[in-house]
């Protein structure tokens, strides 16, 4: 096991225009303050205020959006980070672990990773992801790329269809088809900060949001040693070279994770579990009394000193006995949140310290709050009650289905851009308006400048005389469409769909 030295992980250099001659703790901290400013002032963070947390298209400002959720995660992440550093200080291990002059950057990386953790999520959350992946799967059929004979390949894109005698190209076709059918919010977040927004963050800060380490083009089983870390796609083919450089800069082995990412993940787990239940009460899906009974029933028999008793029952009793003229709802959730944090944050911090050798190496194949403890059981309780009584509610399911239809419909509306031949689309990109393509010209104009420039830059770097050029061009064209639609807010996607379907002016 390598020696734990966080000076080898908290890399303050950047991909472009990296600061030179940095020596003091204050100078390093200023670099991470610059990261903080770039992140907080980015349009992608502002768009989170109109993206779904649980309830799409919600007009009640008391119900959480992705932005308010991310701010709560940021606070919990800071709390866990401070708890870890405090315990390491008590153990006199800060200097031994190379953290004595890096406590500020340690906290800042965690906080900003928490704020950014949902930055790549599409409109309508997981149903938006499913809509994008299903739409591309129906056209690219990545599963057929593994089958024989080649005549069984149902891919509707000629450039990506497998061909006899072209095995090196066929392997690239397989990778591209798999990659495009595995859109994922975490992978899109990496693409956003590096390729689309060009935020030029420090290597350590980007490492903090690389939650999953599986490439989106991965086919087959994942290694048992990394099955949790590779549970979902973490980055796309378009960012393969960047991630390879990131691993080198952060001393990460293949498919391993950056240490501070475990803290971000734990903060997210703690935050959304209570928040989803509070939002459900705000939405009148159930009353706070009904919620308490749901929690009590799901936990089952317990003794007075159990975690359920100390956290949930305690919150319930305090909220009922409060003599102040405040609502039971507000009081219950205040106590529930405080009790939950006071139990789970120290537990997550200690789990981080206890497993630090594996976490530092990036190979700890679990979440911090995923074990056989009562703390893990408490999180499962909150999640299970939400699944049973919130996510399955007819109003929630109706809005999710509408969101799925909106994203699928938008992809279908923009499909003519993917149907153009390579030469025709190249002409459209160069001229921006082509008379014989009136529909395609208008659709192309609607794409954002940022996304169009990302496409042009990527394609301009490709050798145009290479046999791989048509494959890569089509890949980046699909990415262009995924970038544009996934970057929409819920409300913009909803309005755009209705306008283009001529439902309203």
Swiss-Prot record:
UniProt family annotation: Belongs to the dGTPase family. Type 1 subfamily.
Cofactor(s) recorded in Swiss-Prot or TrEMBL: Mg(2+)
Enzyme Commission code(s) on record: 3.1.5.1
Xref: InterPro entries: dGTP_triP_hydro_central_sf, dGTPase, dGTPase-like, dNTPase_1, HD/PDEase_dom, HD_domain
Oligomer and partners: Homotetramer.
Top-level taxon in the UniProt lineage: Bacteria
Function: dGTPase preferentially hydrolyzes dGTP over the other canonical NTPs.
Protein name: Deoxyguanosinetriphosphate triphosphohydrolase
